[in-house]
Amino acid sequence: MFRRIVTLLGHWREAKSAFSTLASLYGDKTGSMDALGGLSDEEMKAVCWWATEDIGYTVVEVGTLFGITARELALQVVGGRVIAIDNFSWNPFGLPPNIHEAFTRRILRGTKVELVNCSSEDWRKQVKGRIDMVFFDASHQYEDVKAECEWAKAAGIKIISGHDYGNPNPLFGVTRAVDEVFGKDNIEVVGMCWRVKR
């Protein structure tokens, strides 16, 4: 199973396209097949651009899944830090948390990503030091996203961003939470990635 997952992640774009095609064949209109995660090329380019507007940024990704976005950020962020947070409680393959974490650590091996096994809530309680940009892609529940956004706003983080803005999945509350905290007119959106720059 481990080899299958490695192969799948090695061909992530093709696999995601295949899953999307499968979903449409089965009439999936909820976006649930997109739960496999990952950013589109356009979204990845935007997130990396946001993270590299200045040299020496500390960038935190909350909800790293397998570390694909964090790995790309680590390649792009010059002179800064990239921290990836995940509690490994969910993945699309149903891997046990310890295997999920070990796999993610393997994906991130050789990068400057600091991987922290922690929930978003627990991490926010203990965070120390300057954070220039945060990218939220952990829980997509309204209450959780709203708490993350309010915390980041109060902490004075320069760039507050995340994924799944405008996602039609009825279980997701990202759009509502982000709009309430920041106001719809203050949000820049690329694909389903959003950002507020302060």
Where are these regions (language model features)?
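Membrane-proximal basic amphipathic "stem/tether" segments
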Residues: 1-35, 196
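S-adenosylmethionine/decaboxylated-SAM
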Residues: 30-198
